[in-house]
UniProtKB/Swiss-Prot annotation:
Transmembrane segments annotated in the record for this chain: none
Compartments in which it is found: Cytoplasm
Encoding gene per record: tuf
Record-linked InterPro entries: EF-Tu_GTP-bd, EF-Tu_GTPase, EFTu-like_2, EFTU_2, G_TR_CS, P-loop_NTPase, Small_GTP-bd, T_Tr_GTP-bd_dom
GO cellular component, one term: cytosol
Residue span(s) of domain tr-type G: 10-209
Identification of the protein by name: Elongation factor Tu
Main location: cytoplasm
Pfam families assigned: GTP_EFTU, GTP_EFTU_D2, GTP_EFTU_D3
List of residues binding Mg(2+): T26
Organism: Campylobacter lari (strain RM2100 / D67 / ATCC BAA-1060)
Entry keyword set: Cytoplasm, Elongation factor, GTP-binding, Hydrolase, Magnesium, Metal-binding, Nucleotide-binding, Protein biosynthesis
Entry-linked CDD domains: EF_Tu, EFTU_II, EFTU_III
Annotated catalysed reactions: GTP + H2O = GDP + phosphate + H(+)
Length: 399
């Protein structure tokens, strides 16, 4: 019945649960669904339904992920939860589930554990901008001082990875107790903690800028010459808006060029503007066909620059995923597929790392042989002879 009330007129935010194995991420996901469904704001999804996550393929990588949706008074949320630690790593690196913010679940009984740390680091590396903390299993800790200690520990850990630990909302509660209450048709103290958590998420995680409000960027897929009219480049607009008469830059592979948009077409029809998500042809003034190639991007002037060297967080496919069967070593030279093209690059491993095995998640430094339009958060595939052997995200630009 709750489904009828679902509306699309609230701002949309993507979030997910992260944290150490068995600290209660999936139970919390089920509890949020159960507590909100009593208010007609969610469809009830039970624990098993969320835990038996379907496997999906994203860029050839198998990832098990559960997606649920729910609403608060103010917003509509899409929430992802992964059953296994490896699924989180893959999810965050491939961007299969882009998160505008995350709920970090920490057991009050155990405090932060190795994967707690790893998920915070990954969030920092792949650009999850905001974290709200749910200190779970508070019903198992009688000592208020112990709860305070765990909270301090979490704040210090967040600060050590450049998140604002002192200002991060931390809500303590029990996902299991809240789930039991909701199942019994009651609204008790534990359910209130879930509502407190959602109020903190509403309040602390900002509504992301819509893609159309961001700076214009369009990866070039193809280039045509139209006699008497000039050069047309085609592609799907990644973000922003482009209008006839706009000054834009062509960035990547060669020196940056500046030109003016003299036409925007979609399905062979002339348009005044194209926006994020549109597949368009853009007519460029005074640009020769041989000056432009696939792999370059059209962008708002000064919004993105070409780079060759960067640090990245990568996941290397295992052999069951169609990846390599053998490890690779320092100076390995695969192709990096960024947006629409492959560029060869050399990989430098971190100090003390001898080799990388299929299935590993590592931080690497890359030097490309040609500059490509890059920024922190740009995602790429690592390929060898046309097959994908890894997936990564730029965590820091070097030059």
């Amino acid at each position: 019945m709750a489904k009828e009330k679902f509306s699309r007129n609230k701002p949309h935010v993507n979030i997910g649960t992260i944290g150490h194995v068995d600290h209660g991420k999936t139970t919390l996901t089920a509890a949020i669904s159960a507590v909100l469904s009593r208010r007609g704001l969610a469809e009830l999804k039970d624990y098993d339904n969320i835990d038996n996550a379907p496997e999906e393929k994203e860029r050839g990588i198998t990832i098990a992920t559960s997606h649920i949706e729910y609403e608060t008074e103010n917003r509509h949320y899409a929430h992802v939860d992964c059953p296994g630690h490896a699924d989180y790593v893959k999810n965050m690196i491939t961007g299969a589930a882009q998160m505008d913010g995350a709920i970090l679940v920490v057991s009050a009984a155990d405090g932060p554990m190795p994967q707690t740390r790893e998920h915070i680091l990954l969030s920092r590396q792949v650009g999850v901008p905001y974290i709200v903390v749910f200190m779970n299993k508070a019903d198992m800790v009688d000592d208020a001082e112990l709860l305070e200690l765990v909270e301090m520990e979490i704040r210090e850990l967040l600060s050590s990875y450049d998140f604002p630990g002192d200002d991060t909302p931390i809500i303590s509660g029990s996902a299991l107790q809240a789930l039991e209450e909701a199942k019994a048709g009651q609204d008790g103290e534990w359910s209130k903690k879930i509502l407190d958590l959602m109020a903190a998420v509403d309040d602390y995680i900002p509504t992301p800028a819509r893609d159309t409000d961001k700076d214009f960027l369009m990866p070039i897929e193809d280039v045509f010459s139209i006699s008497g009219r000039g050069t047309v480049v085609t592609g799907r607009i990644e973000k922003g808006v482009v209008k006839v008469g706009d000054t834009i830059e062509i960035v990547g592979i060669r020196d940056t060029q500046t030109t003016t948009v003299t036409g925007v077409e979609m399905f062979r029809k002339e348009m005044d503007q194209g926006e994020a998500g549109d597949n368009v042809g853009v007519l460029l003034r005074g640009t020769k066909k041989e000056d432009v190639e696939r792999g370059m991007v059209l962008a708002k002037p000064k919004s993105i620059t070409p780079h060759t060297d960067f640090e990245a967080e990568v996941y290397i496919l295992n052999k069951d995923e169609g990846g390599r069967h053998t490890p690779f070593f320092n100076n390995y030279r695969p192709q990096f597929y960024v947006r629409t093209t492959d560029v060869t690059g050399a990989i430098k491993l971190a100090e003390g790392v001898e080799m990388v095995m299929p299935g590993d998640n590592v931080r690497i430094t890359v030097s490309l042989i040609a500059p490509v339009a890059l920024e922190e958060g740009t995602r790429f595939a690592i390929r060898e002879g046309g097959r994908t052997v890894g997936s990564g995200v730029v965590s820091k630009i070097i030059k």
